Amino acid sequence: FDFRNQLIKSELGDTLAYCYQCATCSGACPVAQVTEGRYNPRRLILDSLLGLKEKIFGPENAFNIWGCTMCDTCDEVCPQKVELTEIFIILKNMSVQRGEAPEHYTMQASTVLETGKAIPMQSAIERRRGQLGLPDVMAPDVEEVQKLLKATKLPEKLPKKEE
């Protein structure tokens, strides 16, 4: 139960122990509905309560954590006011520390770090904006974005690029 206690003692995970497994969160979760239960916040909370790291972490279990879109629906409907989204953030951060973040997340983060944007502007979009009379999209201040991301230690959390 060391893992469970670590979660409960964390700044954001102290409401974990309030969960009585009513499954209201899973019933309201849009991801659980779309994935026909493959993503299941109640199960993730249960595995956390039981300290079952092997069911939470590892490449084969990545969707268990990373399927959450942080919409906060589960937090809104929980009768015990368990801060599920905050607990899922803790689990995602642990996953990153273990080097288990899904590749598409780390690739997206690398793109933001390098360019200041999550999605680069495409010429077709620029043309269409011009046709609609919309102003040009301002380029981000890449140095400012990098400064902010370095303050959060993002570069240290990304996989090292092979040269």
Spans of features found by a protein language model:
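Ferredoxin-type iron-sulfur electron-transfer modules in oxidoreductases and energy-metabolism complexes
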Residues: 1-11, 35-65, 81-119
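Iron-sulfur (Fe-S) cluster-binding modules
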Residues: 1-15, 97-163
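Aromatic-residue detector
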Residues: 3, 20, 31-32, 45-47, ...
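Cysteine-centered iron-sulfur cluster-binding motifs in ferredoxin-type domains/subunits
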Residues: 15-32, 62-82
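Well-ordered, non-transmembrane segments within structured domains
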Residues: 28-33, 44, 156-163
